[in-house]
């Protein structure tokens, strides 16, 4: 059976609805990852860091009016923007020096307000260590300025507790095991609005199946911040020695001659987790450029043809032998 989904990036509603009306296949695979094969996918949790606003007091040079970065949780923020009120003075020079030191791009726009824009590097939210989070970088710069108390509390928390730490070490929520690897944290949607008293950092965590993240988060006591869990999803796991896994890996090796790479665990989520017994099988080959979730995403034609041959034999081996 060929099942075509249309909502993979935003909740799998399509496949969930399909299985409410149709019987699940006994087993299956999805071409939504990498070869040789993904036999397990980490658990996922999303949670918000929410700023507790205080009354304005003290002197400051700039007021943080707005701060925005990211549109979806499962991508590293590629562009972020901050709006300030205050005298421009030498802020453009300071920002240019910061960008040069970090080897990043951005710009300053001055009108009745000061707008700072910083460009990072997108990556999949399950591997934030491979991207450059524009929002946390912009917060690092803003943290060097004299800001109003709420703006300062917001950017200081990001700059000192979250920035450059995709594994949660600073907050004390790091965890890893030998089979599923390390927990990762992507700060994917950040929004601050002084007028509406909104200061939120929405986070996407991928973690091993044996880590109780919710209980760990409940123990955190962060100044000026409240942490609220918004969703959880259990890990997906098919034993590595299951016949589904060993058969498909054998087909892959027959067609590629690759005996070095083996089935592995993925931080990302695929349609495989919608099946009681499903795996992600290709179709990015080892050593090939991964442009997933980036501008100009592409696949080489010869890889598509090779993958097609692998899939054809894989389906035959699973269904006809």
Per-region residue spans from a language model:
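Acidic-enriched catalytic cores of C-N bond-cleaving enzymes acting on peptides and small amides
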Residues: 40-42, 46-121, 125-185, 213-224
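Short, well-ordered beta-strand elements
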Residues: 3-4, 118, 200-205
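Short glycine-biased active-site loop of nucleotidyltransferases that positions the nucleotide triphosphate
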Residues: 18, 38-41, 74-76, 270-274
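Short, internal active-site loops enriched in acidic
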Residues: 6-10, 121, 268-271
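Short acidic, glycine/proline-rich loop/turn micro-motifs
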Residues: 13-14, 77, 291-294
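An extended, acidic, His-containing surface patch that forms the Zn2+-binding/catalytic region
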Residues: 126-198, 202, 206-214, 226-321
């Amino acid at each position: 059976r060929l099942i075509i989904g249309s909502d993979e990036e935003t909740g799998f509603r399509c496949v969930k609805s399909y299985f409410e009306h149709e019987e699940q296949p006994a087993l299956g695979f999805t071409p939504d990852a990498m070869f040789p094969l993904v036999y397990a996918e980490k658990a996922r949790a999303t949670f918000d860091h929410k700023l507790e606003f205080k009354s304005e007091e003290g002197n400051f040079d700039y007021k943080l009016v707005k701060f925005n970065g990211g549109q979806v949780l499962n991508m590293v923020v590629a562009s972020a923007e901050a709006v300030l009120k205050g005298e421009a003075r030498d802020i453009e020079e300071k920002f240019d020096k910061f960008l040069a030191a970090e080897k990043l791009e951005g710009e300053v726009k001055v009108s009745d307000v000061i707008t700072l824009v910083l460009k990072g590097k997108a990556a999949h939210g399950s591997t934030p260590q491979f991207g450059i989070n524009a929002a946390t970088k912009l917060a690092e710069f803003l943290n060097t300025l004299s800001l109003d108390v709420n703006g300062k509390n917001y950017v200081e928390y990001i700059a000192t507790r979250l920035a450059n730490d995709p594994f949660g070490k600073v907050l004390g929520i790091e965890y890893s095991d030998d089979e599923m690897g390390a927990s990762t944290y992507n700060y994917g949607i950040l929004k601050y609005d002084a007028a509406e008293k909104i200061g939120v950092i929405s986070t996407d965590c991928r973690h091993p199946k044996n880590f109780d993240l919710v209980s760990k988060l409940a123990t955190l006591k962060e100044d000026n911040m409240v942490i609220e869990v918004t969703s959880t999803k259990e890990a997906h796991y098919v034993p590595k020695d299951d016949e589904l896994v060993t058969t498909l890996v054998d087909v892959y090796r027959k067609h590629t001659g690759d005996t070095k790479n083996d089935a592995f665990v993925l931080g990302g989520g695929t349609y495989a987790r919608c099946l009681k017994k499903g795996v992600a099988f290709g179709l990015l080959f080892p050593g090939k450029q991964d442009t997933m979730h980036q501008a100009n995403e592409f696949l080489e034609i010869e890889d598509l043809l090779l993958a097609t041959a692998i899939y054809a034999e894989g389906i035959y081996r699973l269904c006809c032998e």
